[in-house]
């Protein structure tokens, strides 16, 4: 909708087109090993600032996995150390923290004994007692607190990570989020993050699928294998409608919560035709890959038969969107598959609106990342052909697209000198790589905002010029919150300089009780947002900051010329309704200099 001074009725339910906000630009090389790397973000909706921080990462030194050779999408985990040999699954084993650092047991003191026995966490009581042992990284850098919980009745074990920012992470609370020996459930090799909660009661819940024999030929070398150890990330749900201070998994293995957002990892359970939007509910059993393989570093077989075919972003706003599960974004992954080695060769982002789809513009074609050599399969082995291509928009168009979808309110309030949500502004700049910390100095924040606003303006100026000579803008001058700001619109001859981005439209449907009838001259800097716009139906023409407008005439309801001017505008077929609705017409002209 058309925006004035940051006022809008936009909500989280509105569909945001996909873009690649981070990474994906070029292969990078760092460190003495010279490994090539690249990052491809996932189509994750921003929510209220607490969304999963997931992406696809490529390393030319990486092994095979659910995304093909070299690629991974790692969630937070804690694992037993294997660099010194197969774990013994007793007190002699060492653990690796989420950052890969070796964990050591915290010293026990009289004031802080370690370990301790716990029967509850906060207000939540447990049906059994737990032995809780505190750990810390051998080399301290993150300043988090780690606790290893072991049930004294059933032996179930999990980890709690207390982050320095107050967020609590629960890893491996249920068997679904633990990678264990199928023949000895107590031999847990990895604990995967299963739930996170902020001090404000915002939650993220991670679901996993266990490997099985679906669509696998169980004859030959596949016969007799126990393939149930592997865990695949299936869903990430966040945006709980009602805040909750305690972890849901304390009291339920499957939280019955109204989630507003779900990120789905699809392994072939849904169709991959780009013309057909896939459903939220899986329709088929997952597909088997051509190059299954096994890992044995934990002392038991971890067999992998699956490839992630696509990543889907769903919104759940049934009242606003008319359906329970609305697909809004999609990352479609294409592979060069063969029995020797499978490579990810292409990635496409698609956005969905209603019954149609739109593919992100092709602005950049990437060279193929060099894969590791395939395993030797006799003398005739050859490397699979690479067809890698990544699609990405320019940083300036990304900034403009985000402004149209969510950023307009903060940016325009900031530019006009009004009160603005500073925390939200910092989170936006941090999430879009304009800041490297969420606690910048005033100078760092000011410089980051300047760069971000300049990128929006450059993205706008890169759009095609338009032949429109008249655009419209609807104001509500009688609105108390705007009366002081807009009093300059009431004097003929005034030259108004709008410090913010100014939203207009050639469509007369978006007017209020006051019409700004804006005449344009050749060479003006307004641009129709078109495909970049979030609100597609408005035909929005956006002007950059500091646009000058001169008031040429003001025609109020009841004046001699009002009926004539209103008739010329031809707002609708109902002249009486227009007269009752419209209170004044302000004729203005954009000054190009």
Curated annotation (Swiss-Prot):
Family: Belongs to the SpvB family.
Function: Mono-ADP-ribosylates muscle and non-muscle actin. ADP-ribosylates Chinese hamster ovary and HeLa cell actin as well as rabbit muscle, porcine heart actin and non-muscle beta- and gamma-actin. ADP-ribosylation of actin prevents the polymerization of G actin to F actin, causing actin filament depolymerization, destruction of the cytoskeleton and cytotoxicity; this requires only the C-terminal 120 residues. Does not possess NAD(+)-glycohydrolase activity, unlike most mART enzymes.
Localisation per UniProt entry: Secreted
Chief location bin: secreted
Active-site residues, as the UniProt record annotates them: 473, 503, 540
UniProt-listed Enzyme Commission number(s): 2.4.2.31
Keyword set, alphabetical order: Glycosyltransferase, NAD, NADP, Nucleotide-binding, Nucleotidyltransferase, Plasmid, Secreted, Toxin, Transferase, Virulence
Deleted gene: phenotype: A non-polar disruption of this gene is no longer virulent in mouse infection.
Annotated GO MF terms: NAD+-protein-arginine ADP-ribosyltransferase activity; nucleotide binding; nucleotidyltransferase activity; toxin activity
Pfam families reported in the protein's UniProt record: ADPrib_exo_Tox, SpvB
Miscellaneous comment as given in the Swiss-Prot or TrEMBL entry: In Salmonella spp. the spv gene cluster is encoded on a highly transmissible plasmid.
Record-linked PROSITE patterns: TR_MART
Annotated stretches, region: Disordered: 361-384
Domain of life from the UniProt record: Bacteria
Protein name: Mono(ADP-ribosyl)transferase SpvB
One GO CC term on file: extracellular region
Domain TR mART core, first and last residues per copy: 375-578
Residue spans of biased composition, Pro residues class: 366-376
Catalytic activity reported: L-arginyl-[protein] + NAD(+) = N(omega)-(ADP-D-ribosyl)-L-arginyl-[protein] + nicotinamide + H(+)
């Amino acid at each position: 909708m058309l925006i004035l001074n940051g006022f809008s009725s936009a909500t989280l339910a509105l569909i945001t087109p996909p873009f690649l906000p981070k990474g994906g630009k070029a292969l990078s090389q760092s460190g003495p090993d010279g490994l090539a790397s690249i990052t491809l973000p996932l189509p994750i909706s921003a929510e209220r600032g607490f969304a999963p921080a997931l992406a696809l990462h490529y390393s030319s030194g990486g092994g095979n996995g659910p995304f093909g050779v070299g690629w991974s999408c790692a969630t937070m985990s804690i694992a037993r150390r294997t660099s010194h040999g197969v774990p013994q699954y007793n007190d002699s084993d060492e653990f690796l923290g989420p950052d890969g650092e070796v964990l050591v047991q915290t010293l026990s003191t009289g004031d802080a004994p370690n370990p301790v026995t716990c029967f509850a966490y906060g207000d939540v009581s447990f049906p059994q007692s737990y032995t809780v042992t505190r750990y810390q990284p051998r080399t301290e850098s993150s300043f988090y607190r780690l606790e290893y919980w072991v049930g004294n009745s059933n032996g179930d074990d999990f980890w709690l990570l207390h982050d320095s920012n107050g967020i609590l992470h629960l890893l491996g609370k249920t068997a679904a989020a633990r990678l264990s020996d199928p023949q000895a459930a107590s031999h847990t090799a990895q604990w995967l993050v299963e739930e996170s909660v902020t001090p404000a009661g915002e939650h993220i819940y991670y679901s996993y699928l266990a490997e099985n024999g679906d669509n696998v030929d169980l004859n030959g070398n596949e016969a007799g294998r126990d393939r149930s150890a592997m865990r695949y990330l299936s869903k990430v749900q966040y945006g709980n409608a009602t805040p909750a201070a305690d972890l849901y998994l304390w009291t339920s293995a499957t939280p019955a919560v109204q989630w507003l957002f779900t990120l789905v990892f699809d392994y072939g359970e849904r169709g991959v035709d780009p013309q057909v939007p896939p459903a939220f509910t899986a329709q088929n059993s997952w597909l088997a890959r051509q190059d299954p393989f096994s890992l044995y570093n934990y002392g038991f077989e971890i067999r992998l038969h699956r490839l992630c075919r696509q990543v889907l972003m769903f919104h759940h706003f049934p009242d606003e969107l008319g359906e329970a599960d609305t697909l809004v974004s999609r990352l479609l992954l294409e592979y060069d598959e063969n029995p020797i080695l499978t490579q990810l060769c292409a990635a496409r982002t698609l956005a969905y609106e209603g019954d149609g789809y739109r593919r992100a513009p092709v602005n950049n074609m990437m060279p193929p990342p060099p894969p590791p050599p395939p395993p030797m399969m006799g003398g005739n082995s050859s490397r699979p052909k690479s067809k890698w291509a990544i699609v990405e928009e320019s940083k300036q168009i990304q900034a403009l697209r985000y402004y149209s979808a969510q950023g307009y309110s903060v940016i325009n309030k900031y530019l006009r000198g009004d009160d603005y949500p500073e925390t939200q502004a910092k989170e936006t700049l941090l999430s879009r790589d304009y800041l490297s910390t969420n606690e910048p100095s005033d100078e760092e924040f000011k410089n980051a905002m300047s760069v971000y606003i300049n990128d929006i303006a450059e993205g706008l100026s890169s759009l095609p010029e338009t032949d429109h000579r008249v655009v419209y803008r609807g104001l509500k001058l009688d609105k108390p919150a705007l009366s002081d700001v807009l009093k300059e619109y009431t004097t003929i001859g005034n030259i108004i300089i709008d410090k913010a981005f100014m939203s207009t439209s050639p469509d007369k449907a978006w007017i209020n009780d006051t019409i700004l009838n804006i005449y344009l001259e050749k060479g003006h800097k307004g641009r129709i947002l078109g495909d970049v716009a979030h609100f597609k139906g408005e035909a929005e023409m956006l002007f950059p900051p500091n646009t000058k407008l001169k008031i040429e005439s003001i025609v109020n309801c009841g004046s001699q010329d009002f009926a004539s001017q209103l008739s010329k505008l031809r707002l609708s077929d109902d002249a009486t309704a227009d007269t009752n609705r419209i209170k004044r017409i302000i004729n203005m002209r954009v000054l190009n200099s």
